[in-house]
Amino acid sequence: EGQPLESCVLEKDEDPQTLHLGAFFNSKLIGIISAMPNPCPDFTKHRSFQLRAMAVHPEYRGMKVASQLIQAVLNQVKEKSTVKTVWLNSRVLANPLYLKNGFEPIGTPFEIKPIGLHQRFIKQLHHEI
């Protein structure tokens, strides 16, 4: 929020393995999330996906839209049987959302300028046999 439109374009957006999901209400886009293959700096030996570009329209926050997007993207990533971990850098204000969705914090908070204080989170995927 509050960033220039160009900041919405991310490296690997066009990668064929990258996932872009949206949440809609009455045909209106109310939330987005992306997940892309990207090694986690803390678990470089595992094939990982990074969650990025999570956003929910302010009028729809607090309605579990973000959790539904996270679960939808996790379900799709789990289908890629070689992916072991999903990770992200969360704004610290959003930390409760990721804790609620089974992610674990790693390390200490760090600054991403000009956005603010962030915390890295990781979730180990358990593939059903």
Regions found by a protein language model. Give the residues of each.
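Conserved beta-strand in the GNAT
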Residues: G22, K28-P39, Q50-A55
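Active-site rim helix/loop that mediates acceptor-substrate recognition in acyltransferases
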Residues: E1-N26
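Conserved GNAT acetyl-CoA-binding A-motif
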Residues: V77-S90
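A conserved beta-turn-beta hairpin within the catalytic core of GNAT-like acetyltransferases
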Residues: N38-M54, R61, K80-T82, I115-L117
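Short hydrophobic/aromatic beta-strand element in the GNAT-like acyltransferase core
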Residues: S7, T18-G22, I32, A53, ...
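Generic C-terminal helix-cap and adjacent flexible tail
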Residues: L125-I129
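Conserved acetyl-CoA-binding loop-helix of GNAT-fold acetyltransferases
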Residues: V56, G62-N75
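Conserved catalytic-core motifs of GNAT/GCN5-like acyltransferases
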Residues: W87-N89, L99, E104-R120
